[in-house]
Amino acid sequence: MISVDGLTVEFGGTTLFSDISFQINEKDRIALMGKNGAGKSTLLKILAGVRQPTRGKVTAPKDCVVAYLPQHLMTEDGRTVFEEASQAFAHLREMEAEIERMNGELATRTDYESDSYMELIEKVAAMSEKFYAIDMTHFEEDVEKALLGLGFQREDFDRPTSDFSGGWRMRIELAKLLLQNPDVLLLDEPTNHLDIESIQWLEDFLISSAKAVVVISHDRKFVDNITTRTIEVTMGRIYDYKVNYSQYLVLRKERREQQMKQYEEQQKMIQETKDFIERFKGTYSKTLQVQSRVKMLEKLELIEVDEEDTSALRLKFPPSPRSGSYPVIMEGVGKSYGDHVVFRNANLTIERGDKVAFVGKNGEGKSTLVKCIMNEIDHEGTLTLGHNVQIGYFAQNQASLLDENLTVFQTIDDVAKGEIRNKIRDLLGAFMFGGPEESMKKVKVLSGGERTRLAMIKLLLEPVNLLILDEPTNHLDMKTKDILKQALLDFDGTLIVVSHDRDFLDGLVTKVYEFGNQRVKEHLCGIYEFLETKKMESLRELERKGGKA
């Protein structure tokens, strides 16, 4: 369906990838994998036609519809949420208008035998066949389903898009793309602004309804669930695996071991050849052999080994000062903004050493309750922090508190103590600040995502006994998430984490607080047991509704 031939991208004297080729077929479910900076997003932009390669080409049939969701979106205001999502069908209205226009032209023309008249008839017939094959009778229902599935409430439908944050606007754009039912769907980090329920809905939709999908995502569970093919971008090349992400990791390890074996054998041969040349270069009887070996080395294609992931670092928190037995106790806590009730009558007891998750749809009060704990906003009820509680707090706006005049290295060097001081560069590399140039950048030139990662590292090095993390994984790759998760498992204090990343929460938390319908409900289980319970509750709810009907 889409053919990529000899694609090369160069800029600033650097080759991002060279002479890569692959095919995207109908119903393919492809995950693009590789380190940050390997060129995944660039490749997606080229497939979408919004960027041109240095060399090579991307070809597709004329009627192939490609839809692209970038990481960062420029949105326009002026419509309601429902109207904007309905723009997914604008091309069909344009098609209908074009059919009417061409039929009108046919009605007025009299050159029935001309080639152009016959061509117009054929064009009308082809477009009409395509148009009437599409069921337009349920489009409003489809828009409603997509918006509800992605977390909107019915009362949101008539609100202007300008009322919503960038994350919610991204959901509107995602709904539009899904409703278009394109031949190829290109998604760059689609789960970044979604909650767990919306991610699950998106998974179900992509599996059951989408055609070909190419996705970049750091959400391991999402990628595993929806993809059956993995294309890795590494060192300017691609490797194509006909398996999902988890199986790809196994095959990649085997391939790298094979590469390393071949590399070592080649290096041994090269050294032996160089030794021969050095030993006999002045010996007349060996002149031809020496010259032959010199030419062989000049023509030899060196075996390269894929980049080793150097971020296999074990991060350890400083020892936690001992807190009281109950770091957080809430009785009847609630929060309202005017007539809008976020949640009411929340009763929580978090014990020392607990690792708990706050989950639920966006806007149900997870971050609001965190702000109550941090005493950033007032609230109803009683909220008590235990004896000697020392809080480490990470939120998306923590990055704005960094000293902009310090370098990345200085920012961490100022807080690092003990043996970790000898591993600052390893630590920075693990959080995607690899190399001297990256570590010597001033904070003021960093992107938002880079600042967020730096704020995270800084927090992890401070001695605290209650760690509160609000969406800590949004700007982390899979390896960095693994390092953070292991560090949190080893953390001997108390943890509250707000996250939509199921794989990250799995095995980390043993208690889940669910936010929804103005309530906070406690579940004494891990994330997957909680999700299974929710699934059963949803099925029972459907059965009850079915019984009433």
Residue ranges and their predicted role:
Residues 1-261, 312, 316-549:
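ABC ATP-binding cassette signature C-motif
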Residues 144-150, 275-279, 295-300:
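Short amphipathic coiled-coil heptad-repeat segments
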Residues 155, 268, 305-308:
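Short, flexible active-site-proximal loops enriched in glycine and acidic residues
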Residues 259-281, 286-295, 311, 532-549:
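ABC ATPase nucleotide-binding domains
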Residues 102, 109, 134, 141, ...:
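Hydrophobic stripe of amphipathic alpha-helices that form coiled-coil interfaces
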